[in-house]
Regions:
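P-loop/Walker A NTP-binding module and the surrounding RecA-like catalytic core of P-loop NTPases
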Residues: 2-167
Length: 167
């Protein structure tokens, strides 16, 4: 039963919010899906506003911001809204985290338990290089990843990180 939940996870500055909007746009335009995006990032100033602006630009709905709510509460509200309003896909844009930050990892696990995502995508900056392997392993230890998205592939990075993560 809809919605399919896609949870976006990754390190700070890897491009999760932009990638969330890009995937939402593709689902809307190519797959004809009704998509709701929700920002669970309560740590970075303007993160929720950034997703709202991107949503307006690509004409994809975003969950209204309610100040003071935590990530799990936002995820619960987003799931409820997506069900009630007949969305096919709910995209959860989580807070960027430093992989060593156990508090944020615990929060990510709680969101995963609450939302029971169909897909959990790890967003990795391709410029991370071979460190991407350790990043992927740390995230895999915490939540079951279903895929990896490499960002900034237009730079000087090689594809070695992708091959290493697959192994």
């Amino acid at each position: 039963t809809p919605p399919a939940v896609i949870m976006m996870v990754g390190l700070q500055g890897s491009g999760k919010t932009t990638t969330t909007a890009k995937i939402a746009k593709r689902l809307k335009e190519k797959e004809r899906k009704k998509v709701l995006m929700a920002s669970l990032d309560v740590n970075r100033p303007a993160a929720q506003e950034q997703l709202a602006v991107l949503g307006t630009q690509i004409d994809v709905a975003t969950l209204p911001i309610i100040a003071g709510q935590g990530p799990v509460e936002i995820a619960q509200r987003a799931l409820q809204a997506a069900k009630l309003q007949g969305f096919d896909v709910l995209m959860l844009d989580t807070a960027g985290r430093l992989h060593v930050d156990q508090q944020l990892m615990d929060e990510m696990q709680a969101v995963s338990r609450t939302s029971n995502p169909t897909e959990t995508l790890l967003v990795v900056d391709s410029l991370t290089g071979q460190d991407a392997v350790q990043v992927a392993q740390r995230f895999t230890d915490q939540v079951p990843l279903t895929g990896v998205v490499l960002t900034r592939m237009d730079g000087d990075a090689r594809g070695g990180a992708a091959l290493s993560m697959r192994a």
